[in-house]
Amino acid sequence: MGWVARIDTPRRVEEQRVTATVTAPSVLDLTFVELGTDGRFLAVGCDIAAWITFYASAQARNADTARPIVEDPPLSAGVLLDLSFDGVIPWLLPAPGSTYSNGESPLRARLFARIRTALNVAHAATVTVRALIEHDTVPS
């Protein structure tokens, strides 16, 4: 594999995604497209009680469908980060060094997520990722 140039200056970004409105506990998929191919999680926000999981690829997200929340994912499953929001504290700071990297082939500037909600009333979730992009170009 040849040398892959990084971006000139790593930069902080924030990307927000809003789910569809649902009326019962739900599992919803999100895709972030402005966070580059590789970076570091600085903070993640969610405005409702939910469990959010980030993945290296859509395939990893699909393979994780049946995993119970109380169970850790297998090693090398493509699960990057699991966060539980209580609906009271809207922002969580992942452990220092929590990184993401797109694991698809061909490489794409995508970060995949799944949000699991437990509310029995109409709700939509706003999920926000603050990140430090370290690599944002896709080799041609």
Where are these regions (language model features)?
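C-terminal interaction-tip segments
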Residues: 4-24, 105-110, 114-140
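Intrinsically disordered, low-complexity regions enriched in small/polar residues
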Residues: 5, 34, 43, 53-57, ...
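Short linear motifs in intrinsically disordered/low-complexity regions
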Residues: 9, 30, 39, 48, ...
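Beta-rich globular "head" domains
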Residues: 14-18, 23-62, 134
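Beta-sandwich interaction modules
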Residues: 31-33, 78-112, 116
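Terminal beta-strand-rich extracellular "head" domains
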Residues: 53-96
